[in-house]
Each structure stands twice: as structure tokens, then as C-alpha cells.
Amino acid sequence: MYLTQDLELFHEYTVTQLLFKDVKNATELRKMAVNGEIKGALINPSMVVDAFQILVATNKAVHLHKIGKMKTRSLYSEIIFNLSPTNNISEAFKRFGISDSDTAVHIVLVHNKEETLNIDDIISKVDGQQIDVGQVSEMTDTAKIKKLYKITPQEDKCGTLLDAVVCRMAIKDVA
């Protein structure tokens, strides 16, 4: 149901992703995240192509956190910001964070391997149905993603949407 992976460059950290549909309490979840009651990034799954996209954003966020160069105030807000192709923080939250009307949520948790993570506590806060993280592609709004990341038809023919999105995320700070 959920996906837990170690970060290759930061062996002491583990990333856990959870996906929910038919969520009825997005407003409360968003408020809990803002207040620090949920220590995780709450992401709109319609803007996610694959769990790997989240892993890339998380890896970059942990790296920036460790070297003290984050552009946002927390590790979890940095994950959301890293998903965006632009450097506008508020736009990143509007497009990639959850809104009060959302009925699905992709939760990303980052934890030290030595810490115990109570996944059941997070799951109990969500009034919705947990589904396998691999199903995130079924929720993807492909047209919206292509428009936001400016994916050309030529690029679409020669590579995958995931490759194009991850490339845009990677070069954001360079371009």
C-alpha cells in the first residue's frame, strides 16, 4: 500500500510515500500540516507522474537541508517546491500542494532510519481510502502537467513524460 525507499546519497534517511483517494478531510489535513501536526508533504497527486518524481524532489530537498541552502522554511515545503518547474514558492504550493477541495492526497514522509515512524498514526488522520502508491499515474492530469512543464510534442514522441518532468525539475536552478 505504501512505498518506503532509502535515499541513495543519504543512507541515514528513508522516504515513505502514501496515496489516498476519496479523501473527505483535505481542509483539516492541510491545516494539520501547516501546524506541524503532520510531519509530511501533502501533495496533489494529479500533478505527479510517478513515485520516482517525488523521490527526486525529496532527495534534492534533503540535500539542500543538509547543506543549509533550502529556499523554503521546512523540509516538507522544500519537497513541494522542488516539484515545480519555476522558482515561485507560492505558485508551487498552489499547483502541487493540496487544496481544500481535493479528494486525493499523496503524502511524503522523510525520517531518519533510527527513528520509528508511526505510519498508522498518519493513516488514521486521513478520512479516505488508502491505495497503492503505484496507482498514482491513474490520477495524473497529463494535459495539465504538459502545459505546466512546457512539454513539446517532439519531446513527447522521443521520451517519456516522467523523463521530461524530472529533467525540468533538475535544471530549474540552472536555467
From Swiss-Prot:
InterPro entries: CGI121/TPRKB (IPR013926), CGI121/TPRKB_sf (IPR036504). Pfam families: CGI-121. It is found in: Cytoplasm, Cytosol; Nucleus. Keywords: Cytoplasm, Nucleus, tRNA processing. One of its GO terms (biological process) is tRNA threonylcarbamoyladenosine modification. The keyword Nucleus applies. Belongs to the CGI121/TPRKB family. Component of the EKC/KEOPS complex. This is EKC/KEOPS complex subunit TPRKB. The gene is tprkb.
